[in-house]
Regions:
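Short acidic alpha-helix initiation/capping motifs at coil-to-helix transition points
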Residues: 1-3, 36-39, 73-76, 114-117, ...
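C-terminal accessory module of base-excision DNA glycosylases/AP lyases that mediates lesion recognition
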Residues: 1-30, 133-221
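A positional/architectural concept
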Residues: 8, 15-68
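Alpha-helical ds-nucleic-acid-binding substructure associated with the helix-hairpin-helix region
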Residues: 19-23, 51-52, 56-129, 181-183
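Alpha-helix N-cap and coil->helix boundary residues
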Residues: 34, 54, 58, 70, ...
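A general alpha-helix detector
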Residues: 41-46, 78-82, 120-124, 156-160, ...
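Short alpha-helical scaffolding segments that buttress acidic/His motifs in well-ordered protein cores
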Residues: 42-47, 96-100, 139-140, 189-193
């Protein structure tokens, strides 16, 4: 299952921005896999924090093989130590066990989150241990398939903006300008900026100052 978008979103973004239009035309359609349901998506995102995609996939596969169906009951039954034995840190195992317990006891309502607006859903997900704003926003995009997720906390989105628009840095004010420009299809814009940040268009380079340049500039002030 992939994040779905089509001619409506592409036409809107192409008309809004000439440089993004060039990126879209060069890269073509992007297929990004999404999560089927919210409970497993939260766990999947906690596992993936600060590790490689390959390591995340390995731990997730072990979890599926060990628990079978991944739901609140099976995760609660597994417990923190067994979760940690799958290759994740003890802290992540604690976060996942705590989340499963809240869902099992009815203290966290997954269905309610699915029907909230973006801001409310991010706020509610961020109440969970181990889930910050950025992770909550990624869950909105890759599980709830919300169309207008454009995260200031996403370093790859910022890198993509620097590369496409030749900025040396992206401050909040500048970021908000692009957020407004791409809305209500910020999620699709994010897909293309991630692709650029990952090297999809080799001649686009990151204009962020190197540390040595930044220190030199600071000494001159």
């Amino acid at each position: 299952m992939y994040f779905e978008y089509g001619e409506k979103e592409i036409s809107y973004l192409r008309q809004k921005d000439a440089r993004l239009r060039e990126v879209i035309d060069r890269i073509g359609h992007i297929y990004r896999e999404t999560d089927a349901e919210l409970f497993s998506s939260v766990i999947h995102h906690i596992i993936g924090q600060q590790i490689s995609t390959k390591a995340q996939a390995t731990i997730w596969r072990r979890m599926q093989e060990t628990l079978g169906e991944i739901n609140a009951q099976t995760v609660c039954n597994a417990g923190t130590q067994r979760l940690q034995s799958l290759g994740m840190t003890f802290r992540k195992a604690e976060y996942i066990a705590d989340f499963a317990q809240k869902v099992h006891e009815g203290a966290f309502d997954l269905e309610a989150v699915e029907h909230m607006n973006d801001a409310a859903a991010v706020q509610e997900l961020s109440r969970l241990k181990g889930i910050g704003v950025w992770t909550a926003e990624m869950i909105l995009l890759f599980c709830l398939k919300r169309p207008d997720v454009f995260s200031y906390d996403d370093l790859a989105v910022q890198r993509g903006l620097r590369m496409v628009y030749r900025h040396r840095e992206i401050n909040r004010k500048l970021f908000e300008k692009y957020r407004r420009r791409f809305s209500p299809y910020g999620s699709v814009a994010s897909l293309y900026l991630w692709a650029v940040a990952g090297g999809a268009i080799p001649e686009m380079k990151d204009c962020k100052p190197k540390k040595s340049e930044k220190k030199k500039a600071e000494r001159q002030v």
